[in-house]
Amino acid sequence: MQTRNTFSWIREEITRSISVSLMIYIITWASISSAYPIFAQQNYENPREATGRIVCANCHLASKPVDIEVPQAVLPDTVFEAVVKIPYDMQLKQVLANGKKGALNVGAVLILPEGFELAPPDRISPEMKEKIGNLSFQNYRPNKKNILVIGPVPGQKYSEITFPILAPDPATNKDVHFLKYPIYVGGNRGRGQIYPDGSKSNNTVYNATAGGIISKILRKEKGGYEITIVDASNERQVIDIIPRGLELLVSEGESIKLDQPLTSNPNVGGFGQGDAEIVLQDPLRVQGLLFFLGSVVLAQIFLVLKKKQFEKVQLSEMNF
């Protein structure tokens, strides 16, 4: 009897642990995946629209700076660094999905020219691996190896993200040529304001959906508010739901207008995009340039020697 009770207790504990773990996973996934560039994979075939706008801006409404550093030129079949910088104040805290305050995460999407791709691990130097850290990059699509995404990752550790990039070789890829190419980047810090289905997150301002008098503000048990607005002209009631984590700007009995902010703006993050240019350099052209420069240097040396020889001849003639 005691053994049966023990097994029953173990079964209940295992079931409870699985349930709690599943709930944590669902909440975490919902609060993270819908707020970073990696989520665009599920909704957009290409992250860059025809207008040049990167689609991450559809969910991250605030504009913030982002920067990218790449070499001016690279040789074919070589590995180089593309460093994306996402600056922000490390002291800032954002509103999380559970209504609490937490640190900001960052994410980025890097759009390379056709043929450029993520460098394989065996081609990455130890120095570059140290800069990369524990980051794990993904292709935007299996057939789009030139578009890379990363995130969410801790912003305090990865406000600078180093992408290891392998340059293509026109000798093996006939679609690639020795030209100047553009590189586009988008980077965000913090959660988004709009979910892909168009609904708001709890990281944005909530406005009144009707004008009138606030007759009641109900604080919900699990956080958040229900604000009842009564239209004085027809006594129609409207209830606005405010999610947890937001600070109210209104109170009961107050008269408000349509679209008037009910909460303060909690967003401390934002999205930005930038671009850079890189030249895929022909090695023969480099060799030709070096040969030309060497020829110029030798010519200068010979001119100097010839001048000195001429001066010696003149000096000897003057002595006679």
From Swiss-Prot:
Signal peptide boundaries: 1-35
Gene Ontology cellular component annotations, sorted alphabetically: chloroplast thylakoid membrane
Pfam families assigned: Apocytochr_F_C, Apocytochr_F_N
Keyword set, alphabetical order: Chloroplast, Electron transport, Heme, Iron, Membrane, Metal-binding, Photosynthesis, Plastid, Signal, Thylakoid, Transmembrane, Transmembrane helix, Transport
Compartment annotation: Plastid, Chloroplast thylakoid membrane
Matches recorded under InterPro entries: Cyt-f_TM, Cyt_f, Cyt_f_lg_dom, Cyt_f_lg_dom_sf, Rudment_hybrid_motif
Listed cofactors: heme
Membrane-spanning intervals of the chain: 286-305
Annotated cofactor note: Binds 1 heme group covalently.
UniProt GO MF annotations: electron transfer activity; heme binding; iron ion binding
Keyword Kinase appears in the UniProt entry: no
Membrane topology: Single-pass membrane protein
One of the GO BP terms on file: photosynthesis
Residues the record lists as binding heme: 36, 56, 59-60
Post-translational modification: Purified from leaves as a water-soluble monomeric protein with a mass of 28.16 kDa, cleavage occurs after Gln-287 and separates the heme-binding from the membrane.
Domain of life the protein comes from: Eukaryota
Function: Component of the cytochrome b6-f complex, which mediates electron transfer between photosystem II (PSII) and photosystem I (PSI), cyclic electron flow around PSI, and state transitions.
UniProt cross-references to PANTHER family, sorted A to Z: CYTOCHROME F, PTHR33288
HAMAP family: Cytb6_f_cytF (MF_00610)
Homology family: Belongs to the cytochrome f family.
Subunit organization: The 4 large subunits of the cytochrome b6-f complex are cytochrome b6, subunit IV (17 kDa polypeptide, petD), cytochrome f and the Rieske protein, while the 4 small subunits are PetG, PetL, PetM and PetN. The complex functions as a dimer.
Protein name (database record): Cytochrome f
